[in-house]
């Protein structure tokens, strides 16, 4: 076991897959000589050269389209968005090409493509560079969507994403790159479509992902001290949602709290509520509650920025309210 930062875990995953498979390549702005805006691709250029670690102009629609073409013709490109918000400029390519070509070609084309990069709130990067785009991409048919949350799952998930024959959008949070954790030195893979049970409990199911996993775990000691026993699931897969793992948990706890950094309107939480009500309504002792970011552009001011996203004290209050109110009703 060795203790590594998340950005190092992501780089190790990329390096290992490039070493094993000559078709794996990296494409994006400053991914080569500079080593990536968050150093996820540092030193890969010197090892693999210009043809496999390709610096591009600031033209997201162009190099994303190029990567899609490369995937169709047999390569396994990894597109790094310097910031995931920039990929809105390539939304047409991601939606109409990457997401649909396997279907519209009658299965004649596969698209082994990973689109990865940083996003999220917390570094005072302003409204345009602090967007939460998970739900934007969730609506596109044909995409798989993953959000890593620890160095361990970041490495295992990225290796699985690179090997997958379908396009995978891989979300990384800007505030988690310097998170450290011991990870195995031996190779391991993590399935792209499975949630992780972070903590087992019996009172309430907390569904979360990415940075909010850590806000939830920060709230746990106070909840446990006050006699509450929550079960915590890190969704990891945002498309498809792992409704089987969610079902197992909800059938045990009968209460659900969703904690997300996504916007409240039409966010990941909204889709979760829809699926839980569709599949598990009779199992619920209380309405599903979601804690989401406010539907406003992210402020540049640090205090205002922090106020737009869910904090641990809000999670504590929500758990207590849901559990206490539903116990009163059921008794």
Curated annotation (Swiss-Prot):
Q: Would you tell me the protein name for this molecule? A: Pyruvate dehydrogenase E1 component subunit beta
* Gene3D superfamilies on file: 3.40.50.920, 3.40.50.970
CDD domains reported for this sequence: TPP_PYR_E1-PDHc-beta_like
The reply to whether Metal-binding figures as a keyword in the UniProt entry is yes
Keywords assigned: Chloroplast, Metal-binding, Oxidoreductase, Plastid, Potassium, Pyruvate, Thiamine pyrophosphate
Which GO terms label this protein's molecular function in UniProt? metal ion binding; pyruvate dehydrogenase (acetyl-transferring) activity
Against SMART domains, the record matches this protein to:
Transket_pyr
Q: Which GO terms describe its cellular component?
A: chloroplast
């Amino acid at each position: 076991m060795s203790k590594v930062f998340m950005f190092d875990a992501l780089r190790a995953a990329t390096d290992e897959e490039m070493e094993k498979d000559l078709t794996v390549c990296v494409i994006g702005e400053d991914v080569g000589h500079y080593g990536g805006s968050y150093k996820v691709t540092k030193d890969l250029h010197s090892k693999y050269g210009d043809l496999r670690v390709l610096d591009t102009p600031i033209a997201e629609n162009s190099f994303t389209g190029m990567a899609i073409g490369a995937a169709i013709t047999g390569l396994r490109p990894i597109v790094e968005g310097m910031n995931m918000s920039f990929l809105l400029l390539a939304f047409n390519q991601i939606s109409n090409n990457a997401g649909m070509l396997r279907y519209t070609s009658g299965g004649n084309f596969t698209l082994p493509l990973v689109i990865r990069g940083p996003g999220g709130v917390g570094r005072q990067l302003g409204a345009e560079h602090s967007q939460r785009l998970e739900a934007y991409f969730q609506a596109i048919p044909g995409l798989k969507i993953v959000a890593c949350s620890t160095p361990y799952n970041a490495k295992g998930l990225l290796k699985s994403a690179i090997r997958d024959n379908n396009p995978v959008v891989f979300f990384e949070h800007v505030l988690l790159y310097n998170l450290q954790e011991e990870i195995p030195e031996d190779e391991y893979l993590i399935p792209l479509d499975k949630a992780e049970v972070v903590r087992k409990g019996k009172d309430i199911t907390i569904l979360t992902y990415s940075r909010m996993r850590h806000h939830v775990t920060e709230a746990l000691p106070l909840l446990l001290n006050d006699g509450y026993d929550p079960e915590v699931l890190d969704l990891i897969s945002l498309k498809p949602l792992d409704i089987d793992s969610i079902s197992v948990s909800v059938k045990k706890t009968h209460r659900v709290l969703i904690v997300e950094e996504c916007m409240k309107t039409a966010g990941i939480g909204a889709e979760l509520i829809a699926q839980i009500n569709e599949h598990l309504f009779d199992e619920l002792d209380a309405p599903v509650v979601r804690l989401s970011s406010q539907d406003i552009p992210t402020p540049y001011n640090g205090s205002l920025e922090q106020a737009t996203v869910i904090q641990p004290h809000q999670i504590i209050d929500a758990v207590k309210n849901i559990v206490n109110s539903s116990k009163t009703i059921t008794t």
